């Protein structure tokens, strides 16, 4: 099963906007604070936040979006729901 994860940090308006957008679309995602979990962020090569990643059922990255881009997020949601 594909999975959506979002790397974020506290007091980040674009991070909040991504979460609000995903919630408005009823999309489940895992939120990870990149500053509280720097090892995982580094392992996933996260360089800035928000970073939204779509992973396959083995944890391999399928797609990545950096920043707030509703059109790109919609494409990612379609791919997520397409299974």
Label each residue range with its predicted role.
Residues 1-27:
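Local sequence-structure signature of Cys/Sec-based thiol-disulfide redox active-site neighborhoods
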Residues 36-41, 72:
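Short acidic active-site motifs
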Residues 41-45, 77-80:
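Short amphipathic alpha-helix with an adjacent loop that forms part of the alpha/beta core around
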Residues 44-53:
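Structural micro-motif
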Residues 56-83:
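Non-catalytic, surface beta->alpha helical segment in thiol-disulfide oxidoreductase systems
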């Amino acid at each position: 099963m594909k999975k959506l994860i979002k790397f974020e940090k506290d007091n980040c308006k674009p991070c909040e906007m991504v979460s609000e957008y995903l919630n408005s679309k009823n999309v489940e995602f895992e939120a990870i604070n990149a500053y509280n979990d720097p090892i995982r962020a580094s392992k996933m090569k996260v360089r800035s936040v928000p970073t939204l990643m779509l992973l396959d059922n083995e944890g391999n990255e399928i797609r990545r979006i950096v920043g707030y881009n509703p059109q790109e997020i919609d494409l990612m949601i379609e791919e997520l729901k397409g299974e």
